[in-house]
């Protein structure tokens, strides 16, 4: 029987109502108490790593999560990590890059409603996450609403609906149907040895372009290590900003371009405005989600 480590970090799934609103309070034992059928699926140990609203989760916290997984990888067949949904996409993406070529299943999950409230999605999501981890396929995934999402393609598209997540720019990795794990593609062949990335760079500044953004704004960014421009559509940068972007690049700043669209990616070659941005030296982030691009940049992959 698979032996799984559950790492609890807080989030809505662990929330209780307080005088100041929902706040994480339930520990891993309380969450597991809602899953009597789990004992027939796998054996479980728990680690209560932190108790945070995911809004408060930092890069250092995500490094702690990666370290907890890495330090226990020889002892367990897989991992389930409970997490708040608001920044789950950021955590799934960064863990994908902090643990490249990971050779065990690491499945993140959470819920849009707290455990124990009527019609909560928490019991289903948590049980499905254990099903996915127990299945044994290596990699970093998120399990939400019956869908298994690759960690690098997770996108939260709605702030309240149960069906809040989509797999951006890629088909879901799989799904749970009739309590069984069904994968959409064959397991990938590892392309390297598992490792833990221990050094990250958080000096990355996203700038969301708007139609009337003042070009003078860019002067305060001169020399900043890395800037990600969230551009329009396929990657267009307005002509009136080109001089400011050129100065930014010439100052030594690496400028990357992503899109404000949740899906479709960047295609700088498609329009003249994109080709001009590329000629300035801006770097396309292609079909990466913003969260995945941020994780790759933090880990020095780009």
Label for each model-derived stretch:
Residues 2, 7-15, 28-38, 150-236:
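Accessory alpha-helical/coil subdomains and C-terminal extensions
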Residues 81-104, 237-246:
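Short Gly/Thr/Asp-enriched flexible loops that form oxyanion-binding sites at enzyme active sites
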